Amino acid sequence: MAEEQQEVVPQESGLRKSRVQKVPELPILERRNWLIHLHYVRKDYESCKAVIKEQLQATQGVCEYAVYVQALILRLEGKIQESLELFQTCAVLNPTSSDNLKQVARSLFLLGKHKAAVEVYNEAARLNQKDWEICHNLGVCYLFLKDLSKSKEQLTLALQLHRQDLSAITLGKIQLQEGDIDGAIQTFTQALQLSPENTELLTTLGLLYLQNGLFQKAFEYLGNALTYDPSNYKGILAAGCMMQSHGDYDVALSKYRVAASSVPESSPLWNNIGMCFYGKKKYVAAISCLKRALYLSPFDWRVLYNLGLVHLSMQQYASAFHFLSAAISLHHGNAGLYMLLAVALTYLDDIENAKSSYQQAASLDQTDPLVNLNFAVLLYNQGDKKGALGQYQELERKVSALRETSTEFDPEMVDMAQKLGAALQVGESLVWTRQTKDPKGKQRGAGKGPGAEQAPLGSNQALGRAMSSAAGYSKASGLSSGITISTVSKHPSLPLEPEDPSLTSSTAPDYRRGHS
């Protein structure tokens, strides 16, 4: 029995030896790739670079993954040119990899070499024709090259390959640049189906509906954006602007107070706060806020415009002239600027230049009856009844055109027009959509004798108030550069400033159009 036991033991030990196997050796080129990846995803870049250095020394510098990760780290450190050279090395080590070419093109894009980036992306597309990121980045490059047709073509192809919100957002912004607001709304709505909690999309759609005058839908989308992100800066400004446009200044100020805690250095925010105080007739507080906005954004003509408007209301005409002239030097295409400048020049007794400013305003805006009304008042007070009659007839034509769109007019403007028509004895045919509270005033004015025709029409204060309500006949408030409210702007524009959103290393950033 003892001998049998002795024979069994060696057999068991032999089995144990056969089960113990040596760990297989990894190829020397990829031995430390797992450790490099581990340090990189943990953002332990110093340790990662140390391991990369050891790996490159051991492999004579031909380890593709080590070079690739080192290039990514250099890009994160802002060394774009050095990262480009390393990515080119990766492309030489593995010329069949589309990922290496995508990173080369990405570095060229970040260096501003968009044409070269397009060439490399096209080469990568030949290696991988079903990569939506290549099509998307080609669309972004063409966007920077101002080739909008090719940009839309590539972005549409990217959406066909893979439905995602990034390409849809960029495509919608291109449609906004082309003025296709309805198409942009449709594109953003489709993108929202892919990403229903995207606050940027919700805010953008809210602003577009606000621009089209669909306040109910605008409020719905903006409310959803604030539900997902209560500190959403653009959403807060847009919601506050809607309340501000309807005269709810206290509620709007409460909204702006929330935004001020997160973005205290926002020029549009302080501009809106200033115009809330202006609506509450707290002119000193309005000027204080507007000057802070001007300090934060000294080349924003809208802030200068609003400062001129407030100074006109305070009868500080020289200061108003100063700010309005500065605004015109920055922006030449706004009729309201020239109209307010003409008012300031009128009070400064510079009649000839005031007439020139009114003529310029009338040539820039063929739809605003307020320009012709104030110009007619000036000519009437200067004794030019024939010229005043011509401007009044132009006023009648514009009012008739606006009446078809059910536009509501400012009561003060209606009252002034009726007084002017009574003085010129031509105002009986003018029908307003919104009458004044005292219709008898018009009858009394119409019954004046001929001897009263040349009496000065409108005091300085009345004319100043007419200017301060320059957009009173339009319910839509102006939105600009971050939803800045402008008292004259009748058509709000979508604030879309250039940003650098956090994207993957192989995806070029989307481009946002800067607003008017």
UniProtKB/Swiss-Prot annotation:
**Composition bias, kind Polar residues: at what positions?**
477-490
UniProt-listed SUPFAM superfamilies: TPR-like
Please list the residue ranges covered by the TPR repeats: 64-97, 98-131, 133-165, 166-198, 200-232, 234-266, 267-300, 302-334, 336-368, 370-402
List cystine links: none
Task: List where Low complexity composition bias occurs.
Answer: 492-506
Quote the SMART domains the UniProt record gives: TPR (SM00028)
A Gene Ontology biological process in which this protein takes part is: centrosome cycle
Q: What family, per the record?
A: Belongs to the BBS4 family.
Q: What is this protein called?
A: BBSome complex member BBS4
Organism expressing this protein natively: Xenopus tropicalis
Where is the organism placed in the taxonomic lineage, from the top?
Answer: Eukaryota, Metazoa, Chordata, Craniata, Vertebrata
